[in-house]
């Protein structure tokens, strides 16, 4: 399988990209230094996409009039990854918890129209503090793109539930945390 595989690596940082090219370019890896948003990629051709999507409340200049064209950067990356993924392919990404916990389920609904959630893990608080100097709460999400006409799996991950925040009370009133229903049904996937 490895001999028949083609790997494309996209790295925004020039120094990291040059290191990547130096290490793997001779092995046939197509290393592209630049942003994923500027990369020319054939749609429906990749079997597996791995990404640590950028976190932020800014968008991408995308004039292609796609359902995610005006989405935040992390949601845009997920939408674009699904475009270049072939049916049956997997996308595995680390993103902020806002993708699964956002009160507006519009982007999740768009994703669910094309792909099924295979699994997700809520990573422990502070996972990236030491190595990336960020305290953002993150999820590891795996999606599988469906073939045209393939029935969708149940999509409980479109909805949110309110669960009590342990140890947090305001007077006599319990406070609640809004969390994706998938994690309420799969608490063993909440690692922190």
Q: Model-found features: residue ranges?
A:
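Conserved Class I SAM-dependent methyltransferase catalytic core
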Residues: 10-19, 69-129, 136-143
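Conserved ATPase-coupling elements of RecA-like P-loop NTPase cores
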Residues: 58-63, 103-104
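Short, structurally constrained coil/turn elements
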Residues: 3, 25, 113-114, 134
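Extracellular loop and loop/strand-boundary signature of outer-membrane beta-barrel proteins
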Residues: 65-67
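Conserved S-adenosyl-L-methionine
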Residues: 1-51, 56-58, 96-98, 141
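A generic fold-level signal
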Residues: 2, 43, 72, 133-136
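Flexible, glycine-/basic-rich loop-and-beta segments that form/coincide
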Residues: 129-192
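A general structural signal for stabilizing positions within well-ordered secondary structure
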Residues: 1, 38-41, 83, 111, ...
């Amino acid at each position: 399988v490895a001999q028949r595989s083609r790997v494309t690596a996209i790295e925004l940082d020039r120094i990291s990209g040059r290191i990547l090219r130096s290490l793997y370019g001779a092995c046939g890896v197509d290393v592209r230094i630049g942003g994923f948003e500027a990369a020319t990629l054939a749609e429906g051709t990749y079997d597996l996409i791995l990404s640590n999507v950028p976190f932020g409340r800014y968008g991408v200049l995308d004039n292609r009039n796609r359902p995610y064209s005006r989405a935040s950067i992390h949601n845009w990356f997920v939408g674009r990854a699904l475009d270049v993924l072939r049916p049956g392919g997997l996308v595995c990404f680390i993103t902020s918890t806002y993708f699964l916990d956002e009160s507006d389920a519009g982007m999740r609904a768009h994703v669910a129209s094309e792909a099924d959630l295979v699994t997700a893990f809520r990573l422990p608080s502070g996972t990236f503090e030491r190595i990336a100097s960020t305290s953002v709460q993150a999820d590891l999400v795996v999606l599988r793109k469906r073939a045209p006409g393939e029935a969708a799996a149940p999509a409980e991950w479109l909805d949110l539930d309110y669960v009590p925040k342990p140890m947090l009370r305001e007077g006599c009133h319990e406070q609640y945390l809004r969390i994706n229903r998938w994690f309420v049904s799969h608490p063993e996937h909440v690692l922190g």
